[in-house]
């Protein structure tokens, strides 16, 4: 009788979650983009924290099914495209996504946030304010990245240009990591962003629970120093610097996850030999004081071969499993797979294969979630609304027309929501309750 009662409790809780999200998904199908204060609720909006190898929110585990949309600040800076930002949040929320990732930088380029060192465009900053305020309305938290490794949106190359314009004689983009002037430029930007008071909510960024985490850099690499020492020194300095300004928020590096010299036995998991030569070192980098969780990206089409094949799925599984194991054995922290996807530009691409990629990533995440492991979630690259095709890099998932992908994403959200709502820290390793069998039965279904 107790087992039956336990099953009923689990079932009723799960059904409530499912019905709530199914109604939201129906709203997505009808392309209704309206929201009001009643639909988003007014309950307390708290910071996500970390406890051991898991994220927590109000004492409960917080597993992530999320998305990337890097361009939100840029489109929010123009009233004619600002509505696309709202559409992204509405559509992501409708399939149960709770965390997004976007840029809190645009250095010296079109619609630049930072036009030159410490000189900002207030209208673009207000656009970032808007992004955060809209995210809060839809109960979505954001990982904000603070600079790019790549030239897009300025990146470390723009900082080097600024340095040379100020009279320095810099010859490599990697001077970004070592030159004191450029380090000061970066720290000034970090200080400005963290101390920004949102013009829509009147909340200082460093006090805003809408921000899930600060990301030091998108995909940092320092190929001029394969030993990894230069990048390690930069990470050590900047992680402590961010924490000195904001001890409340989580901090992560923004790594792709490549293994380096400190763990030669793990380099066999790298996608290619070059990955060990780019100056990053997954385990060593994440052992730095001030880093709260590890990030990993998953791009077999960029790293292995542009031609779609089942080897992509095999690599994805082994790559994710290796990093979950490392997070548990060596780091003692959560690992979040903050970017993954497959491009429509790849030879042999079809939407069915993209759906298989989604299922593979979600299965690996759920395998860790079931046992209370370090695999804390994933964020697909990337969610797009209709009408933003001109920003599409090939990886866009249009939720209103990719119906199978939307259902897969929604199902993952429902499964993780069951854990988030039913688990507590009294059952630390994966909800080991008497009703675990009933819970496993629910999670094994392809439809909820």
Swiss-Prot record:
> Could you list the residue ranges forming a coiled coil in this record?
none
Stretch forming the signal peptide: 1-26
EC annotation from Swiss-Prot or TrEMBL: 3.2.1.78
Q: Which residues are glycosylated?
A: 79, 164, 169, 202, 350, 367, 435
- Which InterPro entries does the UniProt entry name for this protein? Glyco_hydro_5 (IPR001547), Glycoside_hydrolase_SF (IPR017853), MAN-like (IPR045053)
Recorded GO cellular component terms are: extracellular region
The main location is secreted
What does the tissue specificity note say? Ubiquitous.
Identify which residues the record assigns to the active site.
Answer: 219 (proton donor), 339 (nucleophile)
- For the protein in the UniProt heading, the enzyme class is hydrolase
Protein's cellular compartments: Secreted
The set of disulfide-linked cysteines is: none
Positions bound to substrate: 103, 218, 299, 381
What reaction gets catalysed by this protein?
Random hydrolysis of (1->4)-beta-D-mannosidic linkages in mannans, galactomannans and glucomannans
A single Gene Ontology MF term assigned here is: mannan endo-1,4-beta-mannosidase activity
One family from Pfam that matches here is Cellulase
Q: Name one GO biological process term.
A: seed germination
Per its UniProt entry, which superkingdom is the organism in?
A: Eukaryota
**Keyword set, alphabetical order:** Glycoprotein, Glycosidase, Hydrolase, Secreted, Signal
Q: Which family does it belong to?
A: Belongs to the glycosyl hydrolase 5 (cellulase A) family.
UniProt name for this protein? Mannan endo-1,4-beta-mannosidase 6
Q: Per the UniProt entry, what species is this protein from, by scientific name?
A: Arabidopsis thaliana
Read off the lineage from the record: Eukaryota, Viridiplantae, Streptophyta, Embryophyta, Tracheophyta
């Amino acid at each position: 009788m107790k087992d039956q009662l336990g099953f009923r409790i689990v079932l009723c809780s799960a059904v409530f979650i499912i019905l709530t999200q199914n109604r939201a998904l129906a709203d997505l199908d009808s392309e209704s983009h309206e929201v009001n204060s009643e639909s988003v609720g007014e309950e307390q909006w708290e910071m996500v924290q970390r406890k051991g190898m898991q994220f927590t929110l109000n004492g409960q585990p917080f597993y992530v099914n999320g998305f990337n949309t890097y361009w939100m600040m840029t489109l929010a800076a123009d009233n004619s495209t600002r509505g696309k930002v709202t559409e992204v949040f509405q559509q992501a929320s409708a399939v149960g996504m709770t965390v997004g990732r976007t840029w809190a930088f645009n250095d010296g380029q079109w619609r630049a946030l930072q036009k030159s060192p410490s000189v900002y465009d207030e209208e673009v900053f207000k656009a970032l304010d808007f992004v955060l305020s809209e995210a809060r309305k839809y109960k979505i938290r954001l990982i904000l990245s603070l600079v790019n490794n790549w030239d897009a949106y300025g990146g470390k190359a723009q900082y080097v240009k600024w340095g040379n314009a100020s009279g320095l004689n810099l010859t490599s983009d990697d001077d970004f990591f070592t030159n004191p002037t450029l380090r000061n430029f970066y720290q000034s930007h970090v200080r400005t962003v963290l101390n920004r008071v949102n013009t829509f909510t009147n909340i200082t960024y460093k006090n805003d629970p809408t921000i899930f985490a600060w990301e030091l850099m998108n995909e940092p690499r320092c190929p001029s120093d394969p030993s990894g020492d230069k990048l390690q020194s930069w990470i050590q300095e900047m992680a402590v610097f961010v924490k000195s300004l904001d001890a409340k928020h989580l901090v992560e590096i923004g790594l792709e996850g490549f293994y380096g010299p400190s763990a030669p036995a793990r380099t066999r998991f790298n996608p290619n030999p070059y990955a060990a030569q780019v100056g990053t070192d997954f385990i060593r980098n994440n052992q730095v004081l001030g880093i709260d969780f590890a990030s990993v990206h998953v791009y077999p089409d960029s790293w292995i071969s542009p031609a779609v094949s089942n080897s992509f799925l095999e690599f994805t599984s082994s790559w994710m499993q290796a990093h979950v194991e490392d997070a548990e054995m060596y780091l003692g922290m959560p690992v979040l797979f903050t970017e993954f996807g497959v491009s429509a530009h790849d030879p042999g691409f079809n939407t069915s294969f993209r759906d298989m990629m989604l299922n593979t990533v979600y299965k690996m995440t759920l395998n860790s979630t079931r046992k209370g492991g370090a695999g804390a979630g994933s964020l697909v690259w990337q969610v797009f609304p209709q009408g933003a095709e001109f920003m599409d890099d090939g990886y866009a998932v249009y939720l209103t027309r990719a119906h199978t992908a939307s259902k897969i994403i929604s199902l993952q959200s429902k499964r993780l929501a069951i854990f988030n709502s039913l688990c507590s820290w009294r059952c630390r390793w994966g909800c080991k309750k008497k009703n675990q069998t009933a819970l496993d039965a629910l999670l094994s279904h392809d439809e909820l």
